Regions:
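Short, structured helix-loop boundary elements
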Residues: 13, 17, 21, 122, ...
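Hydrophobic alpha-helical core bundles mediating ligand binding, dimerization, or RNAP-core interactions
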Residues: 20, 24, 28, 133, ...
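Helix-loop "lid/cap" segments that line or gate small-molecule binding pockets
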Residues: 98-99, 150-153, 168-174
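Glycine- (often His-adjacent) and acidic-residue-rich active-site loop
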Residues: 1-29, 46, 158
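Alpha-helix N-cap/N′ positions at the starts of helices
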Residues: 3, 90, 111, 162-165
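Terminal low-complexity tails and localization/encapsulation signals of metabolic enzymes
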Residues: 184-196
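Crotonase-fold acyl-CoA enzyme core
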Residues: 29-144, 176, 181, 190
């Protein structure tokens, strides 16, 4: 559903930065260079790192059982990677609401926001995703590769710069006492005690 938060507890900024570089930049590079459309199929919870993985795909299909969220802010962290793309997808004010409220939202709202491509009934989701993938696979591989690369270049011109800033912002937040307290409190299933 999301990132293993133990990976962030008691880590230095350098360790977190290297981890996030692999997670954000390397993931984007892999998705960008894969040469074929990628499809995220969500039939449960997608939070934090799960949202990062889903949003890196070209098409996002979700069932009515899908739920989404950016709970990092509840732990004293920042959902910084999503600052780069979410406002472009759903608009500044809606993005700010989702990113800074930490609230859970569901596939109906995600569809209305334009965050997912389609909402499919849960029992049909695997068949529908397979159908979409088969349809895409019947297209000219050269056209799909060139077209997808052009589409990504056009739509993600500032993505790398935004990701670099997001990694820095996340690291700055993740190493604060509040973030470490938020992470520990979550893992220990208690309310955080914030510094004031």
């Amino acid at each position: 559903a999301g990132l293993d938060l133990n990976l962030l507890v008691n880590k230095s900024g350098l360790e977190i930065r290297e981890f996030l570089k692999r997670l954000y930049i390397d993931l984007w590079d892999i998705q960008y260079n894969i040469g074929k459309p990628t499809i995220a199929s969500i039939n449960g919870a997608a939070r934090g790192g799960g949202m990062t993985l889903a949003i890196s795909c070209d098409i996002i299909i979700a069932s009515e059982k899908a739920s989404f969220g950016y709970p990092e802010i509840n732990l004293g962290l920042l959902p910084a990677i999503h600052f780069t793309h979410l406002p472009k997808i759903i608009g500044r004010y809606k993005a700010f609401d989702l990113l800074f409220s930490g609230r859970t939202f569901y596939s109906e709202e995600a569809l209305l926001l334009g965050l997912i491509s389609r909402k499919i009934p849960s029992p049909e989701i695997n068949d529908k995703v397979t159908e979409i993938a088969l349809n895409l696979s019947k297209k000219s591989p050269t056209s799909m590769n060139l077209g997808r690369a052009a589409f990504l270049r056009t739509n993600d011109l500032d993505y790398r710069r935004g990701v670099a800033n997001a990694v820095e912002d996340f690291c700055n937040a993740a190493t604060t006492p509040d973030a470490q307290e938020g992470l520990k409190a979550f893992l220990e299933k208690r309310k955080p005690i914030w510094e004031t």
